[in-house]
C-alpha cells in the first residue's frame, strides 16, 4: 500500500484518517495542499472519485466560502481554480495508488487493507 493523505487543515476527518492508518501500522505520507501543487492528472483522478469538480470544493467555514471557487458552477473554471489554489479542496483526500476517497471513508480503507494482506 502506498497511502497519501492530502490535507488543507486539521479537521476531525483528517484525524480519523491519520488514526486509522497509525493504528494499523500502515505507513502514509501527508501532503499539505497549501504547499503541494497538484498536477492536472492528479486532480482528474480526484474528480473521478468525487463525481464532479464541484464536489471536491471545500465549502465549510467562513474562510472557505470567501474563496471564489466556492461559488463557481462550471467544472472547467473550478478545475483551473483548484490547480492554482489546491487549499480549496475538501480534505482529507486519501489516495492508495489509483484509488481515492474524499473525506473519511473507513469502510473503503478497510477494503484496501484486506486487499493488501
Task: Annotate each predicted stretch with a short phrase.
Residues 35-117:
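Thiol/selenol-based redox catalytic cores and closely related redox-interacting motifs
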